[in-house]
Amino acid sequence: MKNIIYCILLLFSFNSYALETINIEHGKADPTPIAVNNFEADSASDNTVGHEIVKVISNDLKLCGLFHPISSASFIEEKTGIGYKPLFAAWRQINASLLVNGAVKKLENGKLKISFILWDTLLEKQLGGEVLELPENLWRRAAHKIADKIYEKITGDTGYFDSKIIYVAESGPDLKKVKRIALMDYDGANNRYITDGKSLVLTPRFSGSADKIFYVSYATKRRTLVYEKDLKTGKESIVGDFAGISFAPRFAPDGRKAVMSIAKNGSTHIYEIDLATKRLHKLTDGFGINTSPSYSPDGRRIVFNSDRNGVPQLYIMNSDGSNVQRISFGGGSYMAPSWSPRGDYIAFTKIIRGSEGKTFNIGVMKPYPQDDENSERVIASGYLVESPCWSPNGRVIMFAKGWPSNGKSSGKNRIYAIDLTGHNEREIKTPGDASDPEWSNLLN
């Protein structure tokens, strides 16, 4: 974002640190105790913003499950700010391995100047720091960016806190649901509605830059429109009127093409559309249902599900439709694959039918399981779990989770997130029912 100016503090190096890097891919790690100290402020209003920034940073670090923010009620040292050396013994006494000190100041141009330093209290060393200048109303993004820097320093991976979620917001009784496209921060804050609820909408999808989305709108019983909407300008245009489309297209990584499934003459096939010319190119052949395509991060391959062999399974093909390979071989029906932005895993929904009914599962697998016999792994299960999507760093999966109605209450749908390891499942708060989540890349 052009109105954010980054000024890296040169005397704070991110190149060396003493704490052992947290491995976020293997098993459940014990959370690292961290103290996020009150940010120093020059005025009462700056102090209020500083307190809110500390709350957001602490919440980000807590939600990811890798850090344990220590309550400020336990703090011994009362000094705040970045212009002094902390009393490390006081922080070690409350078991804080890491310390974040910061300051916030309103500049003459109306912007906020927000600074922070990350300390290793065990070796009494600075791990890094940064200064951000940005409009006052973007203080929350500054907090997310600081949390991202801390996450990156300690895990060695990029963070995911400064990102957005697009989803379908649902309201009203079960048989008369009003569905609107909604946008929110990754943690559920700043929720706003993108559509008015006058028509049924489904499967919103981000562009690679998170500035644009696709979504499907059932304008009438006979018309299924795909819209492209610019989230910055609000401008909306019709990509096409595609009878038989079931999911919104997914953008290619380069943003010039998209891929989708369309039902015609008893079969459903994968098509690629050139967004400039609106020209369609059919990628799959034969009889059956081929749907839910998702590009690999480099745009060279596409994963999709197909029932060409009787039961829906996962397949990979080149982006031109050649070299089709089946990659799932387990029992059950595989659906809604989503390729990790790192390229190392594919998430999917798996439905297993048994004597007591259907069980829904969210799983992950390697793109080429023949190289790893134990590549498939279920990480979440429930009455209804579906629509998996990935965090920008490919280490967290978000999905929709549903419960049935009963005599006392109607059914409900919510959005949940879970780590790639299968640990730390948590609800992402929304104003009401929610489905079809999609996670953006990190914001600019």
From Swiss-Prot:
Q: Does the keyword Ubl conjugation apply?
A: no
Q: Which Pfam families match?
A: PD40, TolB_N
Q: Which GO terms describe its biological process?
A: cell division; protein import
Keywords of the record, alphabetical order, are: Cell cycle, Cell division, Periplasm, Signal
Q: Where in the cell is it found?
A: Periplasm
Entry's Gene Ontology cellular component terms = periplasmic space
UniProt xrefs under Gene3D superfamilies: TolB, C-terminal domain, TolB, N-terminal domain
What InterPro entries does this protein map onto? 6-blade_b-propeller_TolB-like, PD40, Tol-Pal_TolB, TolB_N
Signal peptide start and end residues: 1-18
Family per similarity comment: Belongs to the TolB family.
HAMAP family referenced in this protein's UniProt entry, alphabetically: TolB
Quaternary context: The Tol-Pal system is composed of five core proteins: the inner membrane proteins TolA, TolQ and TolR, the periplasmic protein TolB and the outer membrane protein Pal. They form a network linking the inner and outer membranes and the peptidoglycan layer.
Q: What does this chain do?
A: Part of the Tol-Pal system, which plays a role in outer membrane invagination during cell division and is important for maintaining outer membrane integrity.
Q: What is this protein called?
A: Tol-Pal system protein TolB
